[in-house]
Structures are given as C-alpha cells and as structure tokens.
Amino acid sequence: MQNHLYTALKKYAQSNPIRFHMPAHNGIDLEIDTSMDITELSFSDNLIESDGVIKNCENNIANAYSTKYGLMITSGATTAIAIALHTAKNKGKKLLMLGDLHKSVHNYANVLAFDISYSENLDNINPNDYDAIIFTSPNYFGKVQDIQKLKNTTALVIADSSHGAHFAFNSKLPDLQTDIANITVLSFHKTLPVLTGGAGILTNDEKLYQMLVYSRSILHTSSPSYLIMASIDNAICEMALNGETLYNQVISEIDNFKKHLCDRYFVEDNDDKTRLCISAKEKDGYKIAKLLESKNIYLETIYFDILVAIVTPYNYKHLPALANALNLIDIQDNIKRFEIKKATKIDTNNKKIEFLQIKNAVNRVCAATVGIYPPGIPMLTVGDLITKQTIQFLTDKKHTVFGLIDGKIPVFTD
C-alpha cells in the first residue's frame, strides 16, 4: 500500500517551491512539533470552556484587534461562519445575504432554515427589515465593502473577514470595521503564520459573546488541535509586536514588483495592498500558472486572466523571481471571463434529491451549492435553475469544481 498524499506533500516540500498560496506561514519553521500535540490536560485548558491558558490567548486576540472578545477556532472559518449564523438565528429568521459570499454561508443559511433574501448592494435596502445581514469584506481579491449604511441598524451585522486577519497589524491596511460589524469572522491561516484551520471570531457585545461560546460548544469539534491554537498564539504575539515593520516591507516590495513587471500585465488596484491580483490582459491565466509551476512557483489561484498571489512577510523576497518568470512568459491564448448570472429560484419544498451526470442536468433545479474553488463563491445555490451555459463552464477542466458528488450534481426530483 502506498501513502499517496504523504508522498505528494513530501515531494512538494523537498522541491523548495516558491509559495504565494495559503497557509500564510509559507512553509517556514513555526517551532511547533508533534511533542506539543496533546489533549485537555490539567494545565492545557479546554477550548470549549476556556478559563486558563487558552482563555489568555483569546484575550490576546481581542486586544490585538481592539475588540472586547475573541474566540479561537481550529476547524477553519467554515466552522466560524456556522457559529456566527447559529448565533444570529437566536435573533430571528430573516437573513440578508449581501454580495458574493463563500459557499459555507449559503450552506449553513440553508441548514439553519433562515428566511433568505439576496442583494448585490445596499441600494434600496432598509437594513432594519432584517434580523441579520452577512457580507464579505475583504473579498478574495482584496476589495473592502463600504458598510457605513449598516452603522446604526437594528439587524445583527456579520462580517466574513476571512481574508483580512492581517489588517489590524499595519496602518497602511484597511480597517476591519469591527465598530460596525457585531460579529467578525477571521481566517488566521489565510494571511498570518498559522497552521491550516486556524480561525477566529471577534465581537464587542457581551451577550453575543456568550451566545457565540454556546454555539461553539455545539458546532466545534471537541478535539481541537493544540498545534493550531499554539500557532495562532504565536502569530498574534509576533504580529502585535512586529506587524507594522513586517508589512511595510511587504508593501514596499510589492511596489517594486509593479515597476519590474512588463507591459503584458498590470497589477489591479486593491484596498488590501498585500493581495496581489495580476491581470494578464485577457490572456489565459491558467496556462500562465502552469508555466509558472514548471518553474516551481505556485500562486494562490487563477480566475480567468487574473493571477492571485498572497504576499506575506515570509514570501515577499521571492517577488523578483515571480516578476522575472512572468516577464519571460508570452502566450497568445485569449480567455473570456464567465459572467455569473443570478439564477431563477424554484420552490423546493418537500422535494427529494437525486444525482445526475452534470451534462444531463440542464433545466433541472440544483439541490446544492456548486461553483469553482478558489474563490469558493457558488454559481448555483439550492433552488437555482441549472442552465446549459453554467454546465459548459463547470465542465471546463481548468477549474476545480465544488458541490459535485463523484462527478454528479445533486438536483431535486421533478
């Protein structure tokens, strides 16, 4: 029997790759080893009912982000989203889902049986009509959403700030807007030197904090990883002490990168100065990424002609190598972006689910959240009518598709 995954990971690690992908420790030595991998002992506290060293770590998180309360999560921002929505359900059922949201939001909003409304923006929206509002800021491409209109709303405001965990540590980066959001979800491992799965939740409200802790006790694994928690602890302390200097270096090197990039590309302007989104000007970004990988350079993701790199204090020194490699690549293959159109919603009450080959699912009603990953934003959600155009896109081998079961798509029976 061959250990397939271990072999693949070992081969990758031994190749000394240039990594512009999460987790944001980028393969450095975190000084955490398996001898520290323990369970709840007399001295090590308990995440679900923290009152010792874990509680102290969570207090550090709150202090670092200038909030009253912080919670640690070891099973990723997906669990943090579930906890936030479970907490919101205590207020009421009416949920506004604002703009593009991660698949986990769609999934848990359905599991928790919210009465869901959708809007691309806050135009013509009265926030007080809802019990809760959830939005993404920053998004996968470093754009921050303006939520000033939500400042005095009676709705519970949830910010999925998974990609903004580093914002608090440098004055040139955007504000997390924790003064407006009642609950803020962070994915530490995306932008900080934290093991995969490290996430957190912030709030300034005592009653919400109590409800979040209660929800965590229900939804979080009772076997949290102490190694992940230790990496969060170290990262928060390191960034609180040195984040301003470290990210100044990152931002400066990105500015130099832009100057050395040839005119076949341009870097898109972002609110997050560390999220590098390189436009290949309608050339096939997937082919460019394959050529970069042949040079042992790995990006976070490709989105048509956009190449996304997560730049951190631990990989910014490799930006000249990325610029040089891109400048040597000159492909002629064009690519058109697929515009995701909002699908027609169909009533799915009391219908059963079956699984079809995706090519046979035209004009059927989707029973899952389906899209490409990254960025993890669904193209289809529960109740959407499946079109031929969407199927053509999802069957393009350039993408990693989520939501399919052994290549089949869940649909409701006619």
Please annotate each region the language model reported:
Residues I61, A109, G383:
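Short hydrophobic alpha-helical segments of the AMP-binding
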Residues Q2-K10, A64, M72, G76-F266, ...:
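Conserved PLP-enzyme active-site core in the AAT-like
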Residues C262-V382, F393-L404:
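Conserved C-terminal alpha-helix-loop-beta "cap" of PLP-dependent enzymes
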Residues T400-D414:
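Charge-dense polyanion-binding interfaces
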Residues L95, M379, G383-I386:
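Generic structural signal for buried aliphatic residues
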